[in-house]
Structure formats: structure tokens, C-alpha cells
Amino acid sequence: MIRIGTRGSLLATTQAATVRDALIANGHAAELVTISTLGDRSSAPIETLGVGVFTTALREAIEDGRVDAAVHSHKDLPTAQDPRFTIAAIPPRQDPRDAVVARDGLVLGELPVGSLVGTSSPRRAAQLRALGLGLEIRPLRGNLDTRLNRVSNGDLDAIVVARAGLARLGRLDDVTETLEPVQMLPAPAQGALAIECRAGDSRLATVLAELDDADTRAAVTAERALLAELEAGCSAPVGAIAEVVESIDEEGRVFEELSLRGCVAALDGSDVIRASGIGTSGRARELGLAVAAELFELGARELMWGEGNSPQGS
């Protein structure tokens, strides 16, 4: 029996259940084990709780043998690799884009100046401000139902959340607008899951690897390499999205490339620096580092450490 650790929220258990069911479909007995995390217990802003707020407890459960593996929202994992664990599988990704849920079926551009829009993501808040729509950003915590209720009860005019979460809970009918990357770049690895186990557990890793999706792994690797490079001393809002795309060479042959777009925004929305690049799936990390380097050349470091943003440390 493979014991799969998961956070206790409805979204987390729904995500983990897709992994459990896929393992069972492949002939492997599996069950879910709920683990409480600091991020679930605290109502404080996420950025004040430190790195690994949703993942540390799950990793501890793997290490002390309460579970064999854990399912994470990939974007919650610290970018620094922990040698005690291995990401054995990254299943096919859900839609990585952000979504708007607004009153009266409105889209962002239809909301009046001064409308209250909820998000606790600095990345979303910065890019919303950069759109220049005169929206008032308000903090947003709690599970997805709690967030949606703040629109339906009139507390907020709109919220911006990950489309993938709404999809997994069957709430896509609530979406009034899906934001294209040109409007708002998603968080690196948004919409992707990471299935983690002990680094030395090669037998289990082989079983879990049956669920791995090569294109998703390449995209997430590029996005998180960009993030890791940019996080060297900054807490700025960073967005990134990579995708495997088909291209045609001069002789008409079709081949696949990995496309990556990234951005860094000032927290107050006064500036957004964007860069992009093309590479191969086999060199996804190098692509992420190259686009990060271009962002630095365009002034990302000054933007990140400028007024309104502050470095995380030395």
C-alpha cells in the first residue's frame, strides 16, 4: 500500500485523489493520509510565514515514515532542491492561467475604478496594478469556497485565483474571465503537481514515475530555474510560463521547442520587465537561467530592490 500524504483542504485532497486513482488504475494499491500544515492552520499572510509553509510538514511525514510519498502544488515547493527527497513525478499540468471571478459576470476591464479585487499574491497584485485600471487590491486568504463567497456576499467586487484550482473543484462556471499571459503571467509551476518521495526509495520512485509527463516537467523546470535565479536576494513578484510548441525548420520538418516567458514587476505596479526565450526540453534549466539573465540585463535587479520592493537578505 502506497501511503500518499496530502494537505487537508478540499483542493489538496482532490488533487491528491487524482494521483491515488491513477496509481490504482496502474495496479498499485494506494491511500491518502491527511497531514496538517502551518499554512493551513494560520490566517497570516503567506509571505510572513516563511518558505515551505505548505510543504514542510508533508516532507517531515515522508522522512519519519508516516507516509511514503506526498502530493504538493508544485508552486508551493521551495526552489532549492532538498537532497533528502526526489520529485519522482510531475503529472500532466492543468491550465496554468489565472482566472477572474467577478460580480455580475464582469471582466476586469468592465469593473469601475475603485472596485475591490481580492488576492494575497504579490505577483497578481503587482500585475493587476500595472494594468492601470484603478482597482483597489485587498488581501485574500482561506480556502477556495471562502474566497468565492467574498464575491457572492458583496464583500469584494472580484477575486483573482488560479484557474486550475477552480477546475479541480468543478467551479469553472464561476469564472468570468481567464487572463491570458500577456495580461498576467502565472506563478512558476502554477497548475502543476509534484509527487515527492524519499531520495533513496528507488522502487517507489519507479512506480510514481509512471505518472510523469515529460512536457510538463520541462516547462516547470524552466519556470522554476528562472524563479530560483531571480530569488537570489529578492522578494519581488515574478511570473513565468513555459510551453512545448511545434516549430518548422527551413526544410519543412516539424520539431518541438520549449518557449519561456518571464516577468518581474514592481509591487506598486509602476513597472513590469518582460523577457522570453526559446530552447529545448532537454536544456530546460538552461533556458530558465538565460531568460532570468535577460531580465537582470533589462533592470530586474534594480526594479526588485527599488522602492516598494526589498531584498530577502544578503
From Swiss-Prot:
- List the keywords (alphabetical): Porphyrin biosynthesis, Transferase
What pathway, per the record? Porphyrin-containing compound metabolism; protoporphyrin-IX biosynthesis; coproporphyrinogen-III from 5-aminolevulinate: step 2/4
Recorded GO molecular functions are:
hydroxymethylbilane synthase activity
> What chemistry does it catalyse, as a reaction equation?
4 porphobilinogen + H2O = hydroxymethylbilane + 4 NH4(+)
Textual note on the cofactor: Binds 1 dipyrromethane group covalently.
Names of required cofactors = dipyrromethane
Q: Which SUPFAM superfamilies match?
A: Periplasmic binding protein-like II (SSF53850), Porphobilinogen deaminase (hydroxymethylbilane synthase), C-terminal domain (SSF54782)
Key word NADP present: no
Give EC number(s), comma-separated.
2.5.1.61
Q: Choose one Gene Ontology CC annotation of this protein and give it.
A: cytoplasm
PANTHER family (UniProt xref): PORPHOBILINOGEN DEAMINASE
Q: How does it assemble?
A: Monomer.
State the similarity comment: Belongs to the HMBS family.
Q: What is this protein called?
A: Porphobilinogen deaminase
The organism is: Mycobacterium marinum (strain ATCC BAA-535 / M)
